[in-house]
Structures are given as C-alpha cells and as structure tokens.
Amino acid sequence: MPTDIFSFKRFDIDQTGCAMRVGTDGVLLGAWAGEDPAGSIPQHCLDIGTGTGLIALMLAQRFPQARVQGIEIDPIAAECARANAAASPFSDRIVIASGDILDSSLESLIGNQRFDLIVSNPPFFKSSLHAPDRQRTMARHEETLPLEKLICRASELLSPQGRLALITPRDRLKDLRLYAATYRLVSSRLTEVRTLPHKEPKRILSEWRPADTAIDRSPFTDTLIIHPATGYYSPEYVRLTEPFYTTSFRILAVG
C-alpha cells in the first residue's frame, strides 16, 4: 500500500485522503514551468487545480520572491494543500483557495491580481465511464474543468507578459492550439515527453503567452526523454528534478 507521505528535499506532501497522488506529470510541470532564457522571473503564480499543493510548493521553492496561489475544487484536497503549504518553509508566500476557478465568486479571492505564471495539470479523461469515487472523478475527468474553459479563464488572468504552462496528453495539442488561438494566446515552448527513446510521446509540456505582447517567432520545441535506457535517467530529466527528489539517480549520458 503506498505511503501517504511523499518527501522531497525541502518539503513533504501529505496525500492522506487525496484522490490524485504525487506523480511524474505534476513533478515535471512544477520543474519545467516558468523557465525563461531571457531571465524573467515570475512574481505572482497561480496553480489551477492544485490538488495536494505539489506544484505550488515547487514554484515557491524555485522562485524565492514569488507569491503563489493555488485553487482547488475538491475541498478535501484543498485542505490537504493548505496543510502541506503551512508545514513548508514557504508558508508565508503560498495561499490555497477552495473553489471552482470558473466561478466568478472567486474574484473575491483573486481580486484584480494578474499572474506572471499560471500552471495547471488539468484532468483529461473524456470518457463517460467515470470512476465510482466522486472525488477521483473530479480529479481525473475533464467535465470538472474542460480544457477550453481552462484556457479561456487563464487568458483572463494572465498579466500582459504572463505565461500559461500546462502538461496534457500529446493528442490534445491540436485542441490546445485551437483554443489558444480563440483566446489570443500563442505557443512559446513545447516539450514532448517520452518515457523511453523508442516510445511515442504520451505527454506534452506547453507554454502559452498573450498574442498581443508575444514576440513573433516560432515556439522553442524539444523532447525530454526520461529513461534513455531501462533503469537509467537522462541528464536532462535529472537537471529538472534533482532540486526536488531526495533519491540519487543512475545517469546514462546520451550521445
């Protein structure tokens, strides 16, 4: 039976009672989001669907001057995230709200704040075959946060130079591009994630900026291979995640 405590280098995640546990998708997004070759550092971050608070805590660790807000529709998970944030070294910079990001009443919590960085590891199952556990259904099925509505809401909350970072199934990229164009966002970074070199990418990390202020250029694209060979990790994966994981890595250099 999996433990309810997942320990990172600088904070712990207590997952007790939470539908979605710590996983590779969340860790990758928390480590990847907000990287900017130009050196821009986000000051105000928003994690939509924060769950246990994992990504919010990762952002607080990476950006020591940033204030981070997490929003979670599941009240049990929201309380879990609050406890995890309160127990962390970053407690004075993290606020967790319980509610639906699509609900206009959340304006009372967000106010006029606009965010330099918005992140989300959204639910993505579209099948009508829902999990029997309502809490798990909210965490995993898109009906609670449709991708188009997420992008629409994020576009309203981004600052002019802000960035929206997502991790989604690779096969949703066409939808992402359509919805982004509808709400005047353009792609600035795309990273395909492969577990092994010969495997097709199942996930994509994507970053989007407001079209009105984005530099007119093609997005930076690359591929992240997690395991160049069975039992080993790539240097790129280690670079992203080593600041967080307490375990040591067996590294196999590629090339």
Swiss-Prot record:
Going by the record, the broad EC class of this enzyme is transferase
**Catalytic activity annotated for this protein?**
adenosine(37) in tRNA1(Val) + S-adenosyl-L-methionine = N(6)-methyladenosine(37) in tRNA1(Val) + S-adenosyl-L-homocysteine + H(+)
GO terms for biological process, alphabetical: methylation; tRNA processing
Chief location category: cytoplasm
Keywords (alphabetical) are: Cytoplasm, Methyltransferase, S-adenosyl-L-methionine, Transferase, tRNA processing
Q: Which residues cross the membrane?
A: none
Which InterPro entries did the record assign? DNA_methylase_N6_adenine_CS, SAM-dependent_MTases_sf, Small_mtfrase_dom, tRNA_Adenine-N(6)_MTase, tRNA_adenine-N6_MeTrfase
PROSITE patterns according to UniProt: N6_MTASE
Q: Which cellular components does GO assign to this protein? A: cytoplasm
MF annotations from Gene Ontology: nucleic acid binding; tRNA (adenine-N6)-methyltransferase activity
Q: What is its EC number?
A: 2.1.1.223
Q: Which family does it belong to?
A: Belongs to the methyltransferase superfamily. tRNA (adenine-N(6)-)-methyltransferase family.
What this chain does, per the record? Specifically methylates the adenine in position 37 of tRNA(1)(Val) (anticodon cmo5UAC).
Output this protein's name: tRNA1(Val) (adenine(37)-N6)-methyltransferase
This chain's source organism reads: Porphyromonas gingivalis (strain ATCC 33277 / DSM 20709 / CIP 103683 / JCM 12257 / NCTC 11834 / 2561)
